[in-house]
């Protein structure tokens, strides 16, 4: 069983960051305005709550959730996120987020091979939930689509980065 102790502090921060980057990649693919962006960001937080109460969550997922419950864990993930994205142009954010997810997937495969598949499926689930959080296009939520073409393409990129089926 992999745990936080299976990773160096730098590696663990990459694992934590991947949870946020999985959602940021989708949000950056097609910004949804203020309300849509708020809904999409809330979904990632909700995924942490779901995983905490899900008895089927892997020990590694539970360790990540536990770290996000501490101010130190949140600060480490936030600081890494800022270091990765600060100074990025809007068009670069998605590419950097997908790259961070890809790096985390490789790290998980190397350090936690028994739990990597479940963790990567969880990251993909977060991405899908973010994509479905708000409608794209239309007016006041009418006439839009649940997942835009840009978001579908990004979900495919994330699936490829994770090595999972979308």
Explain the meaning of each model-derived region:
Residues 1-166:
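Small-residue-enriched hydrophobic alpha-helices in membranes
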